[in-house]
């Protein structure tokens, strides 16, 4: 803002905030997050989450099984990364706590299966967005952006590698590193899965004794949690990947189920709705600042500056690798994943055509860069949503993921270099 407006930086900054609001993304995110907050509050206060956790703990009876079940659930909810991160975090955190799995480790597994499977399973909000973007910039197969997107999926190396790395971490083939290693040691020695420094609310989270919960809830059933979740996913798909419609349907079904079983009173539904919306205020404020930063980066010419650096070293075979490497870093520091793709797509496609490179490759690299940013950007919506659901600070969520994301990042660059030379 200072670079753009000088001494009038305050009014410049406010103008960029207004631009962020007028873009439409914020309004959508605010309403969607409010609906998620209501749904989570209803499921939590009615005991549906606790019952599901108690039921699931019979099968998730070890640390590895718990993380593997989290991984499978993450793959099964592929229609939207917001839905994935929020639902899986809410469902698994109590079971995870009972096995002294640090919240940062759970967050890594949850967020690692968020946008990653959304891009490689083409029935998702991400696939719909990028297929439209491909067509808009002339990247088609048989005149179809959707078919072009399908054709690009095998070249989306970052999400494929990330899912493999996740499995290897869960199995212990790849060791715990950095923040996760530190927090795992604390959890195993003290039973504290989230310290006051890490907790979003500054409250120490202790691992519960799930044996007693199962004993008290021997008839615990998963349906009060699973039925709203299935309705949410089903309506989302039937409504042309409209997560908002799915979320509203999930809220309605949850309310009916809980009222019918007398688990909650009508007045409590409205109280929980208010508390659910209130719980999302902080994340909405942070996302507003993040999208404002995207507007400022665009206005200051950051994308053009990046391109000016890339031009002297561009080579046709290296284009996909360079696009991924630089755009992933841009997403990590500058924020904006879909926004980043919209900024760089009109630059990347003409460059690919001019250098004689199949535009599917750099376009796949752009998708990968978006996913890398989504997994790691500290103020990004994916990290923020997961952090809120798991009650941990976004910084620790990012730092827990970062070492493994770097592994996927470096291996993806190697894959893009190899494929770039093979397809030139």
What residues fall within each predicted segment?
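Hydrophobic alpha-helical membrane segments of integral membrane proteins
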Residues: 1, 84-89, 160-161, 245-250, ...
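Hydrophobic transmembrane alpha-helices of multi-pass small-molecule transporters
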Residues: 1-32, 155-159, 170-171, 187-292, ...
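Membrane-embedded alpha-helical segments and adjacent helix-loop junctions characteristic
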Residues: 7-107, 265-354
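Alpha-helical transmembrane segments of multipass membrane proteins
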Residues: 38, 75, 167, 233-237, ...
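Juxtamembrane inter-helical linkers in multi-pass membrane proteins
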Residues: 58, 62, 90-107, 182-210
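Alpha-helical transmembrane segments of multi-pass membrane proteins
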Residues: 63-77, 101-127, 142-161, 180-183, ...
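C-terminal transmembrane helix pair
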Residues: 99, 140-141, 156, 284, ...
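Juxtamembrane and boundary regions of transmembrane helices in multi-pass small-molecule transporters
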Residues: 117-207, 368-424
């Amino acid at each position: 803002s200072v670079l753009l407006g000088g001494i009038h930086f305050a009014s410049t900054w406010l103008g960029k905030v207004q631009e962020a609001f007028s873009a439409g993304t914020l309004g959508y995110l605010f309403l969607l997050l409010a609906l998620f907050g209501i749904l989570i509050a209803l499921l939590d206060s009615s005991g549906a989450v606790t019952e599901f956790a108690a039921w699931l703990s019979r099968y998730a009876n070890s640390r590895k099984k718990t993380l593997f079940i989290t991984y499978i659930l993450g793959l099964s909810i592929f229609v939207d990364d917001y839905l994935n991160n929020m639902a899986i975090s809410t469902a698994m955190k109590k079971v995870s706590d009972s096995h002294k799995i640090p919240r940062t480790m759970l967050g890594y597994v949850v967020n690692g299966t968020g946008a990653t499977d959304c891009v490689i399973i083409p029935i998702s909000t991400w696939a719909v967005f990028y297929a439209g973007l491909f067509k808009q910039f002339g990247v088609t197969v048989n005149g179809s952006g959707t078919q072009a997107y399908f054709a690009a999926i095998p070249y989306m190396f970052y999400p494929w590698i990330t899912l493999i790395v996740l499995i290897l971490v869960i199995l212990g083939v790849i060791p715990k590193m950095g923040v996760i290693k530190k927090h795992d040691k604390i959890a195993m020695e003290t039973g504290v899965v989230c310290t006051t420094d890490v907790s979003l609310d500054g409250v120490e989270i202790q691992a519960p004794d799930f044996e007693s919960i199962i004993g008290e809830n021997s008839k615990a059933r998963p349906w009060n949690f699973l039925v709203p979740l299935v309705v949410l996913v089903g309506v989302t798909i039937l409504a042309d990947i409209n997560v908002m419609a799915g979320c509203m349907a999930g809220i309605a079904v949850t309310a009916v189920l809980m009222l019918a079983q007398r688990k909650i009173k009508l007045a409590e539904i409205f109280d929980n709705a208010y508390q659910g919306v209130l719980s999302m205020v902080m994340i909405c404020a942070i996302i507003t600042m993040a999208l404002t930063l995207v507007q400022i980066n665009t206005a200051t010419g950051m994308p053009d500056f990046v391109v000016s650096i890339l031009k002297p070293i561009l080579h046709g075979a290296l284009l996909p690798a360079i696009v991924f490497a630089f755009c992933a870093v841009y997403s990590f520091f500058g924020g904006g994943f879909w926004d980043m793709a919209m900024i760089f797509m009109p630059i990347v496609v003409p460059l690919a055509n001019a250098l004689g490179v199949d535009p599917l490759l750099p376009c796949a690299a752009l998708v990968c860069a978006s996913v890398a940013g989504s997994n790691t950007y500290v103020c990004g919506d994916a990290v923020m949503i997961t952090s809120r659901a798991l009650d941990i600070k976004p910084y620790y969520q990012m730092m827990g993921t970062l070492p493994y994301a770097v592994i996927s990042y470096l291996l993806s660059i190697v894959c893009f270099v190899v494929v770039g030379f093979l397809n030139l």
